[in-house]
Amino acid sequence: MVNLKKIAKEEQGSALITVLIIALIVALFIGVVLGGIYVQSTFIQQDIDRTKALYQAEQQIYEFLYSGQEPDSTGTITSTNYGGFLKISSSTQVKKQKITLEVLTGVLPDSVFDYAIALKDTNSSLSVAGSTTINGDIASGSNQIERSTFKGFPFRGSFTGEAKKKNMRDFFPAFQYESLEVQLDKHSSFYESESKSKFAVRDLSELAQSQEGDTLYFADSQEWSINETTAIPKDIVVLVEGNLTITGDGNLGPYTTFFARDTLSIGGSIMATHAIVSAGIFMELRDQVSMNAQLISRGRIQLMDQVYLTYPSMVYSSTTTYLGEQQEVIHMQDESTVDGTLVYPIETGTFNQEQFRIKIDENALLRGSIYNQGQTELAGTVYGSVLTKQFFFYESPTTYINWIKDAEIDITQRPQDFIVPIGFSDSTKYVILDWKEVTE
């Protein structure tokens, strides 16, 4: 073995030692450069593999939505109903790079939603009174709209559009709401299951310590005050035996589900993103609650004060029983606002007085659409379309069927890329609402 110290001593004063040192430095430099190139090429290759995996995951989603093709052996794709929308998960792997994408999708509305009004009832023509303003075409069983005098006051509003006669039995769309009912059944059956105790927690502090995707069960009614420091994991499912009341200024998190067996009340300035909020008997949102949410219930739903459900929200009720003497299944009161769709899909009574109603008060605003197999009582504003079996309002001592008084419907003000829940059409045109990469 070469003894560098011996060589250095023997060659002291000569140029050999200098050459050896320079050679060593050059060798080290070359090693560092080659090592850097190797590391760099490794990272570049990882980026290339990751990009390929990302592209394949995106391609799987596209093929699933628009061509119905199954993924090849390199990846997997699954879909589940998430309220009225569809949640899709796509996973692929290229070498060591694995990518999972999750998307939330709705659908573009059918052409019937391009009408300001689609009136299913053909027993009487539509009458407009007071200051009612309608901007857009009207589809009904008649090609005439009555501009009516009401208690001596002539019609002073406007109708900009055409009244088009349609066979409303065929033209008025059906809504396939079974998937929503299956989701409600799944949550309802949980309360009867013997395994529910495995998911039991006692209070809000235990909920905050849970993990993403957990299911949590509360055996008693709950009253929570949520603030900005309250951490709620995403994708959790919370089921409460009895009533659930939530107030404060906190955030309920993304993709969370809250289900109360009896009643659910949310107040304060609570927020949420793509949440599902559900109740068995009655649901109320009040104060300055502002959330992107799907409200799903077999009971009555009431929005009050300055509640704002941001796009693309949905409010759905399928109740067939009265709560007291109130026939409103969905009621937008005060200055509440919904950007999305109100849905009541159940056709119940054959007589006018037996119909369940969606009611929008004078200062309330809907940007989107109403789909209602019952009656619509409209005093507020709809920037979008109203698809309803009947219109209704009452002014003592008379009930007025298929009259609209002092309301506004303007299809031109609806959001341009407006979507509706899945279930209105067999030939769906999907729209991606949210897109995220899942970190594993």
PLM segments and residue spans:
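Beta-strand/loop motifs with alternating small/hydrophobic and polar/acidic residues, enriched
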Residues: 2-121, 126-128, 142, 427-440
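Intrinsically disordered, low-complexity terminal regions
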Residues: 14, 20, 26-36, 40, ...
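Residue-level marker of beta-strand positions
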Residues: 15, 27-28, 137, 294, ...
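Short, charged, low-hydrophobicity "junction" segments
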Residues: 35, 113-115, 188-193, 314-323
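Short, ordered "entry" segments at domain starts
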Residues: 82-86, 91-232, 237, 247-252, ...
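Structural motif
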Residues: 120, 218-221, 240-242, 261, ...
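Hydrophilic extracytoplasmic domains
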Residues: 273-274, 278-282, 287-440
